[in-house]
């Protein structure tokens, strides 16, 4: 390690150690913590994120990859060719004429890639009207046709022949292997194989979409989404080769789609790793140059909330940034109210789509990210994290292959069990507020208008992070509708505002995340009329103050509250202040509790 770097690291270490020392009121030499280890954060995949990355990391790794070259970790374009990513928007669930009008407006407003979602309302027979005025050789198409992909493909082929032009790029989106994971509609594997055989005879057409978002919808970690997607891709290639296609032709039929969340650096690395691992597969199969399969990115449905949906705009901005910087071929930003059936009441669909589209355009046109080749490249952190995540994802892929491949692992229940376990951990992290969701388990807006009951329905096939807390809010809304007020709990602030404010703020925020209104009567002193009045009016209270205040007046406050007939006494803080006390609270509210379970119990007690 260079001497200058070593000295800088030592200076940094002393500065950080000084913070710990001041917190513990000790000298630096006396603190009983390993500062470096204390600051390491471990991801759900088991990747340790160090507090600092420097040139020292380069000596342990090989940061030699360049953009546009195998294994394409740093993207598929070389210096000077970067023109950004495609802006994808999906259309459907409307009349063909309305869809056509929306498509033309979107193309004139910055959309470059057109997605189509088919249903009973919008079928293959409607494509001619929907695509009127669209140049198929200029606008890439991404199809979501469920079980009718064959009909849609035939209709598109006919339109292209009628126009006498090849497709700019057409992904038919057949996804039977991944669709079985989240229950989404798709063709059979036999139909998918035949689609690919037919598509292989046409230019710029790929039949197969390995849809990693299906794994994300069911709670997959980043490594799992990548590893399972690569395994599914290999399964498709094997089936296509068995059907008579050459390995080269089979590889040309595969495209990928990944879900991106607002965990910025993890998502940048996820897309980089996915390309690297697929490149390795292509290399083993003898065609390393075919590793440049399209990589579609879409904002993850799991991260979208129904409550305070405006925050979803911010989540989507970070996710789209990560996808673009990570090297996605194109990026689709879902509308901010995607989790709400029919959207936010009173908000037009045009507005929601415009904001989603403009999120991409802001990143491309105002921030100029599209003019930079691999913006994250060369970052010691991103390169190191990419390497570590690649190891974890390859381990997932290898484990699936060891079971006989993707289909065998699905049939045995291995894939489901893997996703269930990861989801339960995510759910627990949200419940304990270790995983923070703004507007949901942190900083909720209890004053927002309740959603109508028919718009609180959970999206099918998606395990949303916010669902458990939003179920509590739904209970609160029902209570409000019936009683004219929300369920309430009274706080008992001890000491002056400057002392109790931190914990009254914490308590208000926590209770609001469960739909409970916290009543703050201001500073109360045990033994006074104001204290007695507040206690007598409350069935459940939360005592709020400093640890010092608890030591001085906490036991007396609890005793007076019991004498006043309070049914349940909670305290904001840790149990240590009441160890061995004859008058201890019934429970504690702090950062270590299962907040979702605690709030559900409180709603039960309040009759909500």
Descriptions of predicted regions:
Residues 46, 110, 164, 278, ...:
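Conserved, mostly hydrophobic/aromatic
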Residues 221-226, 261-273, 300-314, 343-353, ...:
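Short glycine/threonine-rich loop-to-helix capping motif typified by GTGT followed
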Residues 288-298, 307-341, 348-369:
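Flexible glycine/proline-rich, aromatic-decorated loop/lid segments
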Residues 1-18, 23-24, 35, 39-41, ...:
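Intrinsic disorder at enzyme termini
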Residues 141, 179-184, 217-219, 299-309, ...:
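Short beta-alpha connecting loops at secondary-structure transitions
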Residues 273, 279, 283-286, 318-325, ...:
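Hydrophobic alpha-helix feature that most strongly marks membrane-spanning transmembrane helices
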Residues 1-263, 293-294, 330-334, 487, ...:
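Catalytic alpha/beta active-site cores
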Residues 234, 241-244, 252-260, 272-290, ...:
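Accessory "access/gating" subregions that flank catalytic or transport cores
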